[in-house]
UniProtKB/Swiss-Prot annotation:
It comes from Methanocaldococcus jannaschii (strain ATCC 43067 / DSM 2661 / JAL-1 / JCM 10045 / NBRC 100440) (Methanococcus jannaschii). This is Uncharacterized protein MJ1065. InterPro entries: AFP_Neu5c_C (IPR006190), AFP_Neu5c_C_sf (IPR036732), Aldolase_TIM (IPR013785), Neu5Ac_N (IPR013132), Nonulosonic_Acid_Synth (IPR051690), SAF (IPR013974). GO terms for biological process: carbohydrate biosynthetic process; glycosylation. Coiled coil: none annotated. To B.subtilis SpsE. It comes from the Archaea. CDD domains: SAF_NeuB_like. Residues 279-337 form the AFP-like domain. One of its GO terms (molecular function) is N-acylneuraminate-9-phosphate synthase activity.
Length: 337
């Protein structure tokens, strides 16, 4: 299926790029910062704002060195309800990544339009199965995986009732070195799975997501922050509002530039054709009744007369009007055979 519907938006072939501002954990555990992220994402032109939903104790071992960090960034269920309501109020789609099984039910009850699965959970089949059974579209990031693992994950989703799947090419290094971005994998995934494919970006800057649209990405996900200098794990590699807005604008420009793929003269160049192409013209003065030959004709701009591609047709034809040097020769100037 080359096109699916998320909320009121179609995503896939022939549709505008679906742009997700990945708020992630950049709210720093503060609902007010979260709301500001929602507001700024809308102002920047994002189609959706996305967060990460979890209960730390169900997500990370208490013995992990990262437990306290993630605990400090955790938002409550009530706060996610509040963020979703605020997003809907200002007209931007709310999506979240469930990082534990409980949050699948919570987000489904909130009636999120789609589920996002993190790259690290591509092989977490209990989560895939539970999400698939909601019947909601699934956006699946594919960092750290190979085609076999992606194929198996897609089959798990499909076998549990999910029919609307989007794959995101992703490299799970933060930030991703440019030599590892491998944007051509977007084309590989499209050719194998025949479903919408996008790109989840972790590079510095905005070049990679913009280029990925030219390579066929249907969805772009980019980390989004209010300020790159804020404390937290993802702020430094995220796009701030100015950068994100520039990315959105550039993506929309790329969409215009890509066009239909049909090779025809464009409206903006039609007037140029006459001036840029050549006509058959008189090389010297030509008398009425004289035969046209390579000795008395030349090929010059503008292209208002007989096109040069018809040279073989007009050679040895008589001319019925006197022509001065550099006069354009028209079909009406020729006598019959």
């Amino acid at each position: 299926m080359e096109k699916i519907k998320i909320g009121d938006r179609y995503v896939g072939k022939g549709e505008p790029t679906f742009i997700i501002a990945e708020g992630g954990l950049n709210h720093n555990g503060d609902i007010d910062i979260g709301k500001e992220l929602v507001k700024e994402a809308k102002k920047c032109g994002a189609d959706a704002i996305k967060f990460q939903s979890y209960h730390t104790e169900d997500f990370i071992s208490k013995k992990s060195e990262y437990y306290e960090l993630f605990k400090s960034l955790e938002l409550s269920e009530e706060e996610f309800y509040e963020l979703k309501e605020y997003a809907e109020k200002i007209g931007i789609m709310f999506i979240s990544t469930p990082l534990d099984l409980k949050y699948v039910d919570i987000l489904n009850k909130m009636n999120v339009p789609a589920f996002k699965i993190a790259s690290g959970d591509l092989t977490f089949y209990p989560l895939l199965e539970k999400v698939a059974k909601t019947g909601k579209p699934v956006i699946l990031s594919t960092g750290m995986s190979d085609i076999g693992e992606i194929w198996e994950a897609v089959k798990v989703l499909e076998n549990n009732g999910c029919r609307d799947i989007i794959l995101l090419h992703c490299i799970s290094s933060y930030p991703t070195p440019y030599e590892d971005v491998n944007l051509n994998a977007i084309k590989t995934l499209k050719s194998i799975f025949n479903i919408p494919v996008g790109y989840s970006d972790h590079t510095l800057g905005i070049l990679a997501p913009v280029v990925s649209v030219a390579l066929g990405a249907d969805v772009i996900e980019k980390h989004f922050t209010l300020d790159k200098n804020m404390e937290g794990p993802d702020h430094a590699l995220s796009a701030d509002p100015e950068e994100f807005k520039e990315m959105v604008n550039n993506i929309r420009l790329v969409e215009k530039m890509l066009g239909s793929g049909e090779k025809i003269p464009m409206p903006s160049e039609r007037d140029v054709i006459v001036e840029a192409r050549r006509s058959i013209v008189a090389k010297r003065n030509i008398k009425k009744g004289e035969y046209l030959s390579v000795d008395n004709i030349s090929f010059k701009r503008p292209g208002r007369g007989i096109e040069t591609k018809y040279l073989s047709i007009i050679l040895n034809r008589k001319i019925k009007n006197d022509k001065e040097e550099d006069d354009i020769i028209y079909w009406d100037d020729l006598l019959g055979d």
